[in-house]
Amino acid sequence: DRHPELTFGMMFNQRTNCTYRKMHELIHSGAIGDLKRVNWIITDWYRTQFYYDSGAWRATWAGEGGGVLLNQCPHQLDLVQWLVGLPCKVQGFCHEGKWHNIEVEDDVTAYFEYPNGATGVFITTTADAPGTNRLEITGTKATLICQDGKLIMKKLEMDEREWCATCQEGFRAPSYETIEVETDGQNGQHPAVLNAFAAHILRGEPLVADGREGINGLMLSNAIHLSSWLGHPVTLPIDEKLFLEKLNERRATSRVKTGESVFSDTNGTYGSK
């Protein structure tokens, strides 16, 4: 804001994914109604011990400052807040070195509460095989399910809140239509972000992600960590000084790895999760 003449953008390439863009459109158009619940199971990040041993900096508090949340999940944490907004309260359960000989988290379950009373769960690990990538967002009018490259919408005949208050049968749920949602099929990824960045400079066109939005996903990651370290829920925005204090405690006792770094085959790592 101090330099409005400059362009500041984030490389959030997953926002260009046609499925996530369509979900964003449907949610923000009101098509699913008021948010009730969001669940993301993103556990198809499988990593072996060899992966973690391949660099002295990997999976250390001093080298990376975190594990699966900071290394594998930044784009998913950005996407979930881009789609439905930041929660107001977070409870995190980070298991450090649960499945690998590492000092940082490799298994996480986080619980979210949103300002309107909606709730969410975010589950991730680098130890599940074959793993799952399923994002489900439920509103009062419809549920969106993103899995296996498809977007399914289960559209209710009536807003659930209205149905609940007016239906005269105790066990009858509202009927719904299952729709496989069409997208434009475009998945521009990094080139699309760079093209938008250039277009913003040249013609003032919208960025894929304004740089000021970059803090949101990190705030969510830090909140999950801090809550887990403290053993109780935290509210957002978090106490940044307290977070840094707790992180520095872990950095101070971080283990120094020995041995040479090795190169690994990263083919298939950068997919369209």
What are these regions (language model features)?
Residues 4-9, 14-102, 231:
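Predominantly a Rossmann-like dinucleotide-binding segment in NAD(P)-dependent oxidoreductases
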Residues 19-20, 76-77, 190, 194-195, ...:
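A general structural signal for well-ordered alpha-helical segments in protein cores
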Residues 69-73, 208-214:
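Conserved loop-to-helix N-cap of the C-terminal "lid" that shapes the substrate pocket in Rossmann-like
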Residues 74, 99, 123-131:
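Glycine-rich phosphate/pyrophosphate-binding beta-alpha loops
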Residues 105, 110-116, 137-139:
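Active-site beta-strand termini and strand-to-loop segments that position acidic
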Residues 114, 140-212, 234, 243-273:
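C-terminal glycine/acidic-rich active-site capping loop/insertion
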Residues 220-230:
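Short arginine-rich
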